[in-house]
Design a protein with these regions (language model features):
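Extreme N-terminal starter segment of soluble prokaryotic enzymes
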Residues: 2-6
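Hydrophobic Val/Ile/Leu positions in short beta-strands of Rossmann-like dinucleotide-binding domains
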Residues: 8-9, 34
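Conserved NAD(P)H cofactor-binding loop of Rossmann-fold oxidoreductase domains
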Residues: 79-81
Length: 115
């Protein structure tokens, strides 16, 4: 049986890192991979989560990329463009739709099979 793995696209951001931390605290998964276009930020979030977990932990948190995806993994997408001052959420739709299309294309190209 394969190890359960959660991949969080946008894992360097606040929503992705918080989701990763919550899953790590509850030990609901064995491996958490943070994927982010800002690799340094994702690495910092992974390091912070690992430090917060202490010595006695059952989960591994690290950074990775789309090639880490297998067909039995869980992928969560938390990526999106930040809202600029004065900008409405409706004005962000086109930008976030493009981001989502690019992410899904990368996920599918690396062997993910949607259910």
């Amino acid at each position: 049986m394969n190890k359960q793995k959660l991949l969080i696209v946008g894992g360097g951001g606040m929503v992705g890192a918080t989701a990763a931390y919550a899953c790590a605290l509850r030990s609901v998964i064995e491996e958490i991979v943070l994927i982010d276009r800002n690799e340094d930020l994702a690495w910092g979030q992974a390091a912070d989560i690992n430090d917060a977990m202490g010595i006695d932990r059952n989960v591994v948190v690290h950074t990775g990329n789309y090639s880490d995806i297998n067909d039995d993994d869980i992928v969560v997408i938390t990526a999106g463009a930040p809202q600029l001052p004065g900008q409405t959420r409706l004005e962000l739709i086109d930008v976030n739709a493009k981001i989502m299309r690019d992410i899904v294309k990368n996920i599918m190209a690396n062997g993910a099979k949607p259910y």
